[in-house]
Amino acid sequence: MIRIKHIFEAHIIVRDLQRSVGFYRDVLGLQVGIEQPERPAAFFWVGGRGKSMLGIFTIGSWPTQMMQHHLSFQVKLEDLLAAPQRLRCAGISPKGRRTPSYPRGEPTDEPIVFAWMPAASIFFDDPDGNLLEYIAMLPDLPRPELGIVRWSEWNAGHTTRIAGSGTNTMTPVEQLFEDHISVRDLERSIGFYRDMLGMEVGVLQSRSPEGMGGALLWIGGRGRSMLGIYSLGSTWPLTIMQHHVAFEVTIEDLLTAPRNLRAAGVTALGGRREPIDEPVVFSWMPAASVFFDDPDGNFLEYIAMLDDQPQPELGLLLSWSEWQSGRKEGKAKSHK
């Protein structure tokens, strides 16, 4: 089994590319990695080059017609190089570059390299057709003029190395933390993500006899990053948001987020989209969060893991002051 470190990349759909580039760059402070007006699309580094990435695409632009959803998982380079063989042994087809004949990626025996990052990748499908990706950042200088090349081509002709990214980010966002996808069969998908990709089930949410409901899975261990999967027809959260992406921040920055968002003309929201003046706490994690909308209604979240034991018996969703009161009474640390 390939050991996934954390969610690396997520994609959302927007109406106006330039407006959204401005929002994610100027309001959230994300660093533009590359703009592709011919698609049209843009990719942002989250937390600095190589940490995690957000892609935004306009309605109707490629690749939104060719996939239900896309998730990227960061892995070690040595595991990535072994991924094609391991995927085939599990009955899954590894994929590389997209071509007119293979719009979801041509069959491959080796990774491909996105030279502008640079990073090596292998793509594959989950049981519902969500396009998944294993990705490993490369310790090389970006070479955007090369486009997308096979691993053997990159490895043969690229020798310049650097010790690190050298990026000084201006944003308090540390990394991409959470993404959600829709699935047809919840039990089947829990099995796939748990047994095939090695994720740990964090919590199951309101499953009905028909199998509707959802699950949240830890990636790379509790507190690293998280994937939410929801069956088609679930009433939550699919009806309250176009798409959801969570960004990990420090607790200090989270506590000032409602005020900072208001100063930028953005309304701070709770988990049920109600206006708030303080974070909310998901006690089963536990983590504190502040939600807000981007210009297209994508449901965004700042999140900070808390240094406490999970306390779901306090209620799954509390205000920050309620959680703090519980901690002062010794309830939030009763199992330490």
Residue map of PLM features:
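Vicinal oxygen chelate
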Residues: R15-Q18, S72-L131, L138-D140, W151-G164, ...
